[in-house]
């Protein structure tokens, strides 16, 4: 089947789905391409981002964390967005696309619950019926977000199969969509999955990097030495990276979760420690066994607990344009505490991985003058109970 947009990033990407879903993906691609050229669609999307979601988000300079170093560190404050994370950006775009296609229902999957909350709020706003698949384990560890979704009228469906986490929720959501695509839109939550989702999600998140570029030029008069973002599926990172890819003097650093340590096998770092396979409708690196079964990923942060990664990140990694590193649970926890204590900002555990790498860069080169931007992709309200229990068990509180 020919496509309007290139479905691949190098060798990665594609549309590996049952034949029954091909018409739905084709319809989605056509709607997206026409919407991108439609001034009325763009005006409505921009208006929602500004007057409902609260864009542009701030670029905040850290006053205290950089003490004793020559680093200047800024945070792109996606945590200030309505809904609490960057997820709100692209769901507003997808919800408008769903309406454009005449769909009346939204299907979504969620890990940390942030995409679920965003899907629920966009559905409530635009009058769409919403059902959200969530791994049973994540339902337990993200109870505040589950209640938020239900409060906004969404049906939350716990998934008990497999590892009862995000990958299983993704499978159930796709299964649902294959039987209901005529009236339902699958609102995929990250820059992964079958074409055209990775491209759609990137384009509906790219304002993160566009705003950052304008803001840093205004504040510092130059581009940053590096932009840093956490990577699960990769939507906040590709949103930050997209406008900087051509700026080859700006480093792009994606941070995967090392969990209990790469050597433990309990991590979520497929880019550096997985191998290429087919999963979730795409060809991309993933964590898999010797016989090709998808391995369980692990991270303290539910939103990074995903065994694969978006195909554009795989491409940027393969070409060397972006560097991908990993941060352990403990390092992310330390960054979570440090930002809370020294800047009065409680970050999501996902975003804490990106911050932890920036802090590591500062510590390793205290005399190096460097201008860094971390994408603070979400706020940590949803994680305070998880962190509280860990710190209590350690006797730190």
From Swiss-Prot:
It holds the Pfam family PALP. The modification N6-(pyridoxal phosphate)lysine is found at residue 87. GO terms for molecular function: tryptophan synthase activity. Keywords: Amino-acid biosynthesis, Aromatic amino acid biosynthesis, Lyase, Pyridoxal phosphate, Tryptophan biosynthesis. It catalyses: (1S,2R)-1-C-(indol-3-yl)glycerol 3-phosphate + L-serine = D-glyceraldehyde 3-phosphate + L-tryptophan + H2O. Its EC number is 4.2.1.20. Pathway: Amino-acid biosynthesis; L-tryptophan biosynthesis; L-tryptophan from chorismate: step 5/5. Its cofactor is pyridoxal 5'-phosphate. NCBIfam families: trpB (TIGR00263). Tetramer of two alpha and two beta chains. The beta subunit is responsible for the synthesis of L-tryptophan from indole and L-serine. This is Tryptophan synthase beta chain. It comes from Klebsiella pneumoniae subsp. pneumoniae (strain ATCC 700721 / MGH 78578). The gene is trpB.
């Amino acid at each position: 089947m020919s496509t309007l947009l290139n479905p691949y990033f190098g060798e990665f990407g594609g549309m590996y789905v049952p034949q029954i879903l091909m018409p739905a993906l084709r319809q989605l691609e056509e709607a997206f391409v026409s919407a991108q050229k439609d001034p009325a669609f763009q005006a409505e999307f921009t208006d929602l981002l500004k007057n409902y979601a609260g864009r542009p988000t701030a670029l905040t300079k850290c006053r205290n964390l950089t003490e004793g170093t020559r680093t200047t560190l800024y945070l792109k404050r996606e945590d200030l967005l309505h809904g609490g994370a960057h997820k709100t950006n692209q769901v507003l775009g997808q919800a408008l696309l769903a309406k454009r296609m005449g769909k009346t229902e939204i299907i979504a999957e969620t890990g940390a619950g942030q995409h679920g909350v965003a899907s629920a709020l966009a559905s409530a706003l635009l009058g769409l019926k919403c059902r959200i698949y969530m791994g049973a384990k994540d339902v337990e560890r993200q109870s505040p977000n589950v209640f938020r979704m239900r409060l906004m009228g969404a049906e939350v469906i716990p998934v008990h199969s497999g590892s009862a986490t995000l990958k299983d929720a993704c499978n159930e959501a796709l299964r649902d969509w294959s039987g209901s695509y005529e009236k339902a839109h699958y609102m995929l939550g990250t820059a992964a999955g079958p074409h055209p989702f990775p491209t759609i999600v990137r384009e509906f998140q790219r304002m993160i990097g566009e705003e950052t570029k304008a803001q840093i030029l205004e504040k510092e008069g130059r581009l940053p030495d590096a932009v840093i973002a956490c990577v699960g599926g990769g939507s906040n990172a590709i949103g930050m990276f997209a406008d900087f890819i051509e700026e080859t003097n700006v480093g792009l650093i994606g941070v995967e979760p090392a969990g209990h340590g790469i050597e433990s096998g309990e991590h979520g770092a497929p880019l550096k420690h997985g191998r290429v396979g087919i999963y979730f409708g795409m060809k991309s690196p993933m964590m898999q066994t010797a016989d090709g079964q998808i391995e369980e990923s692990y991270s303290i942060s539910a939103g990074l607990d995903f065994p694969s990664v978006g195909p554009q990140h795989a491409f940027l990694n393969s070409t060397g344009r972006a560097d991908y590193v990993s941060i352990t649970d403990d390092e992310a926890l330390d960054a979570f505490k440090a930002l809370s204590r020294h800047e009065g900002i409680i970050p999501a555990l996902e975003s804490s991985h990106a911050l932890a790498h920036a802090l590591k860069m500062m510590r390793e080169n205290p005399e190096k003058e460097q201008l860094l931007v971390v994408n603070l992709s979400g706020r940590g309200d949803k994680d305070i109970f998880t962190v509280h229990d860990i710190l209590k068990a350690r006797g730190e509180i």
